């Protein structure tokens, strides 16, 4: 596949915002600035880093200004409302926690734009179909927020038994006397950890147009569908809150799904993006 096909997304991938965010944080904490917006407004133009030249860094940073606001809590001592722990479960220092929470939000927003531009030219339905006959998986799961479930006109499974299970529990949920994934058509399931659309073997998303492969609800598509197949894993949300506050484990990883055509094609560029964000890069297969 010609790399020119990916130019709209590739141009963004090659100008990662993470180095600029790190500059803003440093300048804000070491300078006489009352707000992060002041720092952004005084950034020089252009800015050249080891990996990229940013002709208009101020305009770029302003796209993410709302996600940078928590940095101001580092000067005000305002509570951030989330706890972050390391791999051993020990709390990290305040600056590490705030920096990670900010970067997770920034990278999530940035990669939504990048993935959306890279995905279109591939005419790929990898994320929209269940496993094929030769794959080891029995089903494909698309996690959904409660507000997204009405996008799918399929059968629902929502009862005490389903809400006591998770899709990948060793002790499987049974529906109508058989494992939940042994069905011919997609279904919505309300699990212990939320809702998801289950695509069994050979099934496809009900919003996928036959023949064209277009998504009927593209403009309103679920959040998880907006972020294939490169996504930030700065933080992993844990199930056990502390005193009612969300708890996250620091991961500092970028995940890239190698089943995806553009991920396979752009591995070097993705590696440079991860390096710019100072993230460990993990390649993984979603289906096999």
Language-model region placement:
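Short loop/turn segments that flank or connect secondary-structure elements
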Residues: 1-288
């Amino acid at each position: 596949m010609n790399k020119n096909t990916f130019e709209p997304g590739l141009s963004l991938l090659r100008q990662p915002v993470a180095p600029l965010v790190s500059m803003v944080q440093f300048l804000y904490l070491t300078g006489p600035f009352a707000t992060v917006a002041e720092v952004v407004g005084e950034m020089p133009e252009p800015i050249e880093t080891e990996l990229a030249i940013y002709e208009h860094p101020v305009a770029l940073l302003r796209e993410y200004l709302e996600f940078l606001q928590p940095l101001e809590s580092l000067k005000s001592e305002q509570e951030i409302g989330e706890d972050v722990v390391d791999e051993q479960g020990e709390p990290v220092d305040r600056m590490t926690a705030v920096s990670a929470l900010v970067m997770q939000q920034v990278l999530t927003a940035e990669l939504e734009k990048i993935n959306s531009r890279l995905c279109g030219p591939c005419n790929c339905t990898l994320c929209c179909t269940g496993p094929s006959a030769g794959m080891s998986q029995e089903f494909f799961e698309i996690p959904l927020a409660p507000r997204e479930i009405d996008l799918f006109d399929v059968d629902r499974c929502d009862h005490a038994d389903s809400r006591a299970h998770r899709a990948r529990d060793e002790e499987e949920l049974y529906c109508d006397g058989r494992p939940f994934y042994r069905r011919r058509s997609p279904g919505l399931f309300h699990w212990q950890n939320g809702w998801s659309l289950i695509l069994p073997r050979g099934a496809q998303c009900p919003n996928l147009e036959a023949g064209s492969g277009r998504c009927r609800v593209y403009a309103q598509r679920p959040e998880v569908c907006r972020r294939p197949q490169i996504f930030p894993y700065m933080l992993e949300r844990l199930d056990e809150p502390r005193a009612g506050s969300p708890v996250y484990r620091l991961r500092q990883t970028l995940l890239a799904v190698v089943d995806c055509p553009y991920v396979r094609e752009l591995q070097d560029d993705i590696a440079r993006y991860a390096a710019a964000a100072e993230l460990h890069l993990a390649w993984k297969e979603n289906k096999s």
